Each structure stands twice: as structure tokens, then as C-alpha cells.
Amino acid sequence: MITIPALTLADLLLPMRWTVWGIALATVVFIARQARHVAPQVRRTSAALVAVTAVLLPLLPTPGAALQQGIRIGSLIASLLVTINLLSRAAARVPRVRDLLEKLYHVPPSRRYGVISLASQFFGGLLGLAGIAMMMETAARQKNLSYQDKLSSFSAVTRGYAALSLWSPMYSNMSIVLAMYEGAHWAGVLPVALAVTALFLVLGITLDKLFGSHRHARVQASAVSATELVREGWPVLLGMFGFLSFMVLTSRGLGLPISAVIIATAPAAAWLLNAHLHGGIAAYGMATRQLTLDMSSFRGMSGEVMMFMASGCAGTVIGSAIPAAWTAAIGAAVAGSPALACLTISSVIVLMSAGALHPMLSAVIVGASLDPAQLGLPVLAHLTAVLVGWGLAIIVTPFSVVSALASRWSGIPVFMISFGANAVFVLLALGTSASMLGLLVRLMAA
């Protein structure tokens, strides 16, 4: 499995044809060796996507370029997933991190949603999906939560995920979308992404204040104050922020994609953290053995790797195969209104994902077929609209990993924890974010 991130890193640093086909070969070998770990449903879905790719590929004017882009997208997601998981596993072993997560759910009920939403930006934004899973696992251990309080807490985590997926480089969302736009950089997207993130957080807190049945609940004697939470958690948050700052500065200083910096440094950071936890003379040897053990457990990720690679290739090929007349008609209908164009991009991604299509596949298809020129949008607004649709699609569709995790840990049916809990939020988020991006486009043009 380590070969795929290594070749992906080489391709990010020095993109060449041999690195792409090396990634493809390494992926095929890995999946073939670990095929017994792949669920039958994943095999069937991936086979269907490969079949669609094979049928459409000969019809494209540049089939090789489309296939190479799909391979790069799939390998980038797999590489980020593996390397960030090494770091998050090491972080989960830190006692202070576990204690801080536990105290998040002892905040007074009227403030709990906002605190959890904000905390998700740190744990999820800097530890990846494993950080989100850690927050859900901790919520599941809280036996004193009513059904409505539990629904509110898990909604705070999932909506926080939708918000952080707009800005965090730890997720494939940002990395994949940047790979679709030549010349786009994370630092250039960050200000707008953070503005929409803040919008999502405020919107979620407002909805919880208005409709949360817990808003008049009594404060328990053991409730944790915000001051105590900050006092206990600042070393953890400072460490997370320090690592993110290091990656950003390294990326800007060396002129490298931030995805390359993450893939290269996350395993090293995990090794150092494991060494710190063990302490003593034998710490470095123990850290190496722990890192090797964590890496060996990733053989069970063959299903995810298969799905990512199949979705990446199918998304770019399908997007390239959609007739230009169709996309031109859509572009002509919405090009006069930047807000309507952004709303169209995000809404189509959400609707496609609600129809059981993988959110990543939906985002790649829409981003590749409805390009900025057709819709009359700057790249920044178009890119952000794709991110908005992708993030919201993940939390409203019952078919995503986040929805499945939330249902498993909460015990709430998956349809209720996804569509039932987030439908109103997603509708409002689509409208308000499109209005914000439309205003941004008009200000940029002024």
C-alpha cells in the first residue's frame, strides 16, 4: 500500500507519464492481492464504473489525458486517506485528546451544538475523517443524552464536516478540486472557503437555536464551561494548528502542492508523536514498530482504493463525454446570473448524490462538464461552488461514509440522521452560499 502514496508524491513533485502508469500498476497489484477484503457491493459498483469508463473512453477526443487525470484523482484520495490515518491514529492515543473530546459533550445544552461544530473544524479539519469518527464515537458513549440532544450533537458533527470540507487540505475534496483547475492553489481559495465555512457554522447554530428542543434544558451541575474547555484544550489545538501552519508554510516556501506536503510529512509527524508517547530510550524503535503496524492494517482499505480509482476515472471520462451542446444549453440559461450559476453547480451535485451516485463522482462529473467558461464564472467561484455541493451532498445522502458512521454510532436510522436531519440545512446552505458567491463575482467584476 505504501507504494501508491510514494508514486503519487513523485507524480505531484515531477509529473511524468511513467509515474501515472506506475500508480495504475501498483493499484492493480494491491487490489488483486487484497481482493478478499473488498465487499461484494464495492466490487460490483467498481466493476460497473470500470465498464462505463471502458465504453466511453474510445469516444473521447483525448482518451489518454482523461484516463490519466482520473488515475491521478483516485490515487490522490487514497494517498491522503492512508497518510492522514497514520497521524490520526497516533493522535487518538494521546490521553489529553481523549479527555478533551469527552468534555465537549458536557457543555451546557444550549451551547453544545456551537461548541461541537467549532471543535469539528479542529479535530476533523486537522485529523481528517478519523477525527470526525473520534467525535462520533465519543458522542455515542454519552448515556445522559436524550434522543433530540443526540440528534443535535451528531448533526453538529456532520454539518461541521460539510463546513470543514470547504477549507481543510486534509480532505480529498479540496485536493481533488484543485487538481481539476490548472493554476489553482489552496492559499488562493482559502479566504472564500473560510467565509462560506463561517456561513455554514452560523446557519447551523441559528437553526439549532430556533428548533432545538433542548434550548430550555437545565444546566447540569457537572457542566463544563467554555473557559474550562479552552484551558484544557489549548495545548491540543495549538499542536494541531502548529502542524497545519508548518504544512502551509512549507508548501508556500518550496512552491509545492499542499497535498504533496501532507503525504510527505504526515507519516513523519505520526512517528514523532508515537515516539513522544512511548518515551524513554527505546521510544524511537517502538514508534517505528507502531507505525509499521498501523501501515500493515491498511490492507483492509483495498475496497476504498478500488472505489476511489474507479470513481476518479469514471468521473473524468463521463464528464468529458457529455455532449457540449447539453452543457452549452445549461450555460446559456444561467450565465447571466452568477448566483444562479453557482446554485446550479452545487444543486446538481447534491441531486446526483441523492440518487445514490457517489458524491466524489458527482462532483468530478459536474466540475468537468460545466466548466467556468460555459457558466461565465471566475475559476474561484466555480471551484467553491463545486466544493459546496460536494460537502453538502455527503451529509444529506444516506449513501455516504459520513452518514453511515453517524447512523452506526448514534443508533439513529441512516435516512433520519442524513436527509431527515440535514435537508432544511442543505437547502438553506445552497441558497445562501450561492448568493454569497454571486455577490463575490459581482464585486470582482466591479
What is each of the regions a protein language model found here?
Residues 2, 17-58, 77-84, 237-242, ...:
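Hydrophobic mid-bilayer segments of alpha-helices in multi-pass membrane transport proteins
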Residues 62-94, 117-121, 286-323:
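Core transmembrane alpha-helical segments of multi-pass membrane transporters/permeases
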Residues 76, 102-115, 146-153, 301-304, ...:
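Membrane-interfacial loop-to-helix junctions in multi-pass transporters
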Residues 118-127, 156-166, 315-316, 349-355, ...:
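Helix-loop-helix module between adjacent transmembrane segments
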Residues 134-147, 176-184, 335-395, 405-410:
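Membrane-interfacial helix-loop connectors
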Residues 144-237, 404-436:
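Membrane-core helix-loop-helix motifs of multi-pass transport proteins
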Residues 243-362:
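Transmembrane helical segments that form the transport core of multi-pass membrane transport proteins
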Residues 434-446:
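Juxtamembrane boundary at the C-terminal end of a transmembrane helix
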